[in-house]
Every structure is written in C-alpha cells, then in structure tokens.
C-alpha cells in the first residue's frame, strides 16, 4: 500500500461539500425538506491513480485515532476549466483533479 498521504492529498472545502457534511450532522445549516442523510459524507482530493479500496484504506489509516470506518467511496474526475488572465488576453486552464466523496458508517465523523 502507498503512503496514505500520497493517496489522499487534502480535504476539499467548497460550499457544496460543506452542505453535504451539514446534511449528515443534523444541524440547521443547509437543511431542506427531505434532504437529511443518515451517514456522514466528506469530500477529499485524491491522487489520479487511486482506486476506491486504496482511498478507503488511506482514510481509515489517516483518521485511525478517531476510529472512523468507511462505508462507501464515490469518485469523479474534475476536468480542467478554461480561464482568462490579464483582462482576457492570455488564456490558461485550471488543473484537473480527482475527487472522492467518502461515506462513513453511521455515528463516525472526523469533525
């Protein structure tokens, strides 16, 4: 197995990712009718060649002190997006990356 920190690069923090975490924690933030999830979900940026079993093992190894158990891993590749730099004269691209949404067993969380 690779080093867990080579597989999982960092925690992915966006408004959507925070809303997904908030739905499972049961607080009032981001709660709509019928939008409550039972199991906590967290989003991470992972290595491009990482598989779902590798991601699950790495998350459990990194958060072993908290005793988390991974229930399910969903992955997706985010494509590079075109950007414009300096008043639209020079064009570039953002970097693409692989994102993993990790579902923990009910009652486990990293927060």
UniProtKB/Swiss-Prot annotation:
Keywords noted in UniProt: Ribonucleoprotein, Ribosomal protein, RNA-binding, rRNA-binding
Question: Would the keyword rRNA-binding turn up in this protein's UniProt record?
Answer: yes
Subunit comment:
Part of the 50S ribosomal subunit. Contacts protein L29, and trigger factor when it is bound to the ribosome.
Record's Pfam families? Ribosomal_L23
- What HAMAP family does the record point to? Ribosomal_uL23_B
Q: Which GO terms describe its cellular component?
A: ribonucleoprotein complex; ribosome
Gene coding for it: rplW
List the NCBIfam families hit by this protein, alphabetically: PRK05738.2-2
Task: Please identify the protein, giving its name as recorded.
Answer: Large ribosomal subunit protein uL23
What is the taxonomic lineage of the source species? Bacteria, Pseudomonadati, Chlamydiota, Chlamydiia, Chlamydiales
Question: Which one GO biological process term can you cite for this protein?
Answer: translation
Which InterPro entries does this UniProt record tie to the protein? Answer: Nucleotide-bd_a/b_plait_sf (IPR012677), Ribosomal_uL23-like (IPR013025), Ribosomal_uL23/eL15/eS24_sf (IPR012678)
User: Which GO molecular-function terms appear in the entry?
Assistant: rRNA binding; structural constituent of ribosome
